[in-house]
């Protein structure tokens, strides 16, 4: 069963209090947590972001869920206006501290833009390109999940 809890324009700190109920109700085995953009827009301090992210990941782990943190989307239009790299670094550190996966959407999309795979500077209402970008993101995420599942299966075999 797949469920989605979408909370647009909500900062990480504001999501954390509601996690306990969601986790208790849904009992997920995997949580993919996309966060950070609203925090960057609101200028949330890196340490405050880290604390909220750490609290959220801890709640997910305590509920028995595996965690994938997904960082922000890349946009050359907002690259000079928002400092997302600091919060993306915080996400990487929190993922490492919790032995969680990080899906580096920011890095992937930046690479696609820089290599010309996608022109992410084009009009924001280009729905065909947005669909193709999200399709590729979905495939990359699925690949990471499958790879992680294979690694976990291999670890389980070696510990038996």
Report residues per predicted region.
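Loop/turn elements at helix/coil->beta-strand transitions in domains of secreted/extracellular proteins
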Residues: 1, 26-32, 61-68, 97-101
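Stable alpha-helical elements in mature extracytoplasmic
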Residues: 11, 15, 19, 45, ...
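Active-site segments of SGNH/GDSL-like serine hydrolases
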Residues: 34-37, 56-88
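Catalytic His-Asp segment of secreted/periplasmic serine-dependent ester chemistry enzymes
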Residues: 75-160
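Surface-exposed acidic, glycine-flexible loop patches that form ligand/cofactor-binding
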Residues: 21-26, 58-59, 148-151
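Solvent-exposed loop/turn segments at secondary-structure junctions
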Residues: 7-13, 36-41, 66, 73-77, ...
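Conserved SGNH/GDSL esterase-like catalytic core that processes O-acyl groups on lipids
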Residues: 1-54
């Amino acid at each position: 069963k797949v469920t989605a809890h979408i909370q647009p324009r909500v900062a990480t700190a504001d999501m954390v209090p509601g996690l306990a109920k969601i986790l208790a109700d849904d009992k997920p085995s995997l949580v993919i947590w996309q966060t950070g953009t609203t925090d960057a827009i609101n200028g949330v301090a890196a340490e405050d972001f880290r604390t909220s992210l750490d609290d959220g990941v801890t709640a997910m782990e305590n509920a028995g869920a595996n965690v994938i943190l997904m960082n922000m989307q890349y946009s050359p239009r907002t690259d000079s206006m928002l400092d997302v790299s600091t919060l993306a670094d915080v996400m990487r550190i929190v993922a490492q501290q919790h032995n969680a996966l990080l899906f580096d959407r920011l890095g992937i999309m930046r690479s696609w833009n820089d290599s010309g795979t996608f022109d992410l500077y084009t009009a924001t209402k280009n729905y065909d390109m947005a669909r193709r970008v999200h399709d590729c993101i979905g495939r990359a995420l699925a690949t990471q999940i499958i790879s992680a599942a294979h690694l976990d299966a291999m670890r389980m075999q070696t510990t038996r």
